[in-house]
A protein has these predicted regions:
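Short hydrophobic/aromatic-enriched beta-strand-loop microsegments
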Residues: 78-81, 178-186, 292-300
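Conserved, mostly hydrophobic/aromatic
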Residues: 9, 21, 47, 55, ...
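Structured C-terminal cap/extension of enzyme domains
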Residues: 48, 53, 194-310
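Active-site beta-loop-alpha junctions enriched in small/polar residues
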Residues: 24-26, 58-60, 84-88, 130-133, ...
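N-terminal binding-site loop/beta-alpha segment at the start of enzyme catalytic domains
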Residues: 1-83
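Glycine/proline-rich, positively charged
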Residues: 45, 92-187, 194, 266
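Glycine-enriched alpha-helix->loop->beta-strand junction motifs that scaffold or abut catalytic
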Residues: 77, 174-182, 200-206, 269-270
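Short catalytic-loop micro-motif centered on adjacent basic/acidic residues
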Residues: 53-59, 158-161, 180-183, 272-274
């Protein structure tokens, strides 16, 4: 099979596949089923066997980190591993709505990174990102960045990043300290596009999340009810936007999911887009789509015209 296209993750210099793997669906809580050992092995080894070399997770994702450690520690040299910090130190079983608030104190940042290292059975993380887009003032008051940089000096973290969104994202970029930004972006969610470009021009690597919006645009609306309540409003808004905009003439035989993924890969500023699934068949389909590369330039431009930035 043809190799996946790759890109340099900004100033990190890491050569990452343009299709990455988002491991949230391994969480095993919050409406996500707990995978058996066989299921976990199939999906995670399938990720690496399919050529993907970038895996993103978080302590907030239930059992995700633990499962990655169990299944992939023996293949650690084959992939780049990204996680988050500032997350509450909790048992994986605690549901989202019962978890403690995020805490960006130096002590909690360090405790979280060290917990991630233990869970994933590794002595370093390639990228650690602050989760849930904390305000710049919070990071400065807590001296949070200094703690991540200390962990970097110790060799436990290679590069630091921000999982950021509007309205804080512009401030995060202006701080000038982040090697990587993880930002939501898709055909139906383009409001961060200018900031993505700004961050890329400043030399940061760009990790896209939500590039296919979990396929909620084309599924029965009742499927959205199966997701945690905190995800549902955004999913409904994206589905509504998709349903009211006709692009059938642009699909050229592709499924909407395929088109969405190739649209995301077509953004010239992106380094990798993380797509999650616990289904090996869906994983294989995602790999096959990514192998096709970006959309033709004229199709990409027309899709942008039909889904303008609000």
């Amino acid at each position: 099979m043809p190799p996946l296209p790759t890109s340099i993750l900004g100033r990190t210099g890491l050569n990452v596949t343009k299709l990455g793997y988002g491991a949230m669906e391994l969480r095993g809580v919050d409406h996500f089923p707990r995978l058996s050992q066989a299921q976990a092995s199939a999906i995670l080894n399938g990720v690496l066997d399919g050529g993907i070399n970038y895996i993103d997770t978080s302590p907030d994702y239930g059992y995700s980190e633990q499962i990655i450690g169990e299944q992939l520690a023996h293949r650690r040299a084959e992939y780049y591993l990204a996680s988050k910090c500032g997350c509450p130190i909790e048992d994986p079983e605690v549901p989202h709505e019962q978890r403690k608030p995020h805490d960006f104190s130096r002590a909690n940042v360090r405790a979280g990174v060290e917990q991630s290292l233990r869970r994933m059975r590794t002595d370093y993380l390639d990228v650690v990102q602050f989760h849930v887009s904390p305000a710049r003032s919070t990071l400065e008051q807590e001296d949070s960045v200094a703690e991540l940089l200390a962990l970097k000096d110790e060799g436990k973290v290679r590069f630091i990043g921000m999982s950021g969104t509007i309205p804080e994202l512009a401030d995060h970029i202006a701080m000038g300290c982040f090697d990587v930004f993880q930002i939501p972006y898709s055909l139906v969610e383009r409001e961060h596009e200018a900031l993505i470009h700004q961050a890329a021009m400043a030399g940061a690597g760009i990790v896209i999340r939500g590039g296919v919006s979990r396929g909620v645009m084309v599924k029965d609306e009742s499927v959205i009810d199966e997701y945690p309540p905190f995800l549902q409003p955004a999913f409904r808004a994206r589905r509504q936007r998709w349903q009211t905009t006709n692009i059938d003439d642009l699909l050229d035989g592709a499924s909407p999911m395929e088109f969405m993924l190739r649209f995301t890969i077509s953004n010239p500023d992106m380094s990798t887009t993380i797509v999650g699934t616990a289904n090996p068949a869906h994983l294989a389909a995602n790999v096959a789509v990514a192998q096709k590369g970006p959309l033709p330039a004229d199709v990409y431009a027309e899709a942008c015209r039909r889904f303008p930035v609000d």
